[in-house]
C-alpha cells in the first residue's frame, strides 16, 4: 500500500512533529510513504517512517538526486519541477495533507480529481460557493489520519492505466499493487 504525505517544504515545528508521527505510524502499518522528497513535511515524514523501518520514495522536482532528504530510500528524479506533484498524487492510494502551501494545494486537487481520498491535518479547506462540502476528510491527530488513510486506501481501486505515465499500446500498464509489491521486495533486500 502506498500512501502519499504532502505538505510545505518550510513547515512549522508542529507540522513537522505531526508529519514525523504520521511517518512512524504508516511504517508500523506496513505502508510505503511517497512524497516530494525534499525538506519540511516531506523530510519529517520520511524521518518518522525510517525510524520504524519503513520504506520511503521521494519524487524529486529536479534532476539532481542529491537534493533528496537523507531519509529517502528511493529518490526518483523527474526534471519536471512542480509538475511532479501529479506523480506524487496519482502514485498513492490515499493522500495525507499536513499544512501546506500552493504546491500542496495542487497535489490535493490532482488527488481529488482522480478519485484518490485526501485526509487533512491543518491543511487547506475547499468548498464551492461558500457551501460546506469540503471534499477533504478532516482529522485531528496523526493516528486518526493514518487509520483513515489505511482504511480508505484498502477500498481505493487501482484502475487500468491509472498512472501518471501513459504506457505504449504494446506494453502492459503497471498497476499500483505491482509497484507496491516491487517496493516491498526491495525493502526486504535492504
Regions found by a protein language model. Give the residues of each.
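Glycine-rich oxoanion-binding loops at beta->alpha junctions
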Residues: 59-95
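C-terminal binding/interaction regions
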Residues: 7-10, 82-145
Amino acid at each position: 500500500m502506498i500512501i502519499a504525505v504532502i505538505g510545505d517544504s518550510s513547515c512549522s515545528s508542529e507540522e513537522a512533529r505531526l508529519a514525523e508521527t504520521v511517518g512512524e505510524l504508516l511504517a508500523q502499518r506496513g505502508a510505503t510513504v511517497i512524497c516530494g522528497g525534499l525538506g519540511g513535511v516531506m523530510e519529517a515524514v520520511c524521518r518518522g517512517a525510517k525510524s520504524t523501518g519503513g520504506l520511503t520514495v521521494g519524487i524529486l522536482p529536479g534532476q539532481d538526486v542529491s537534493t533528496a532528504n537523507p531519509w529517502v530510500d528511493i529518490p526518483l528524479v523527474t526534471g519536471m519541477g512542480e509538475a511532479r506533484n501529479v506523480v506524487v498524487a496519482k502514485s498513492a492510494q490515499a493522500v495525507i495533507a499536513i499544512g501546506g502551501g500552493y504546491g500542496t494545494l495542487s497535489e490535493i486537487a490532482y488527488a481529488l480529481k482522480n478519485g484518490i481520498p485526501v485526509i487533512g491535518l491543518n491543511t487547506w479547506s475547499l468548498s464551492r460557493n461558500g457551501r460546506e462540502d469540503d471534499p477533504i476528510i478532516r482529522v485531528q491527530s496523526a493516528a486518526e489520519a493514518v487509520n483513515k488513510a489505511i482504511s480508505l486506501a484498502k477500498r481505493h481501486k487501482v484502475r487500468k492505466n491509472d498512472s501518471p505515465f501513459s504506457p505504449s499500446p504494446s506494453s502492459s500498464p503497471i498497476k499500483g499493487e505491482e509497484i507496491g509489491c516491487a517496493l516491498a521486495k526491495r525493502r526486504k533486500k535492504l
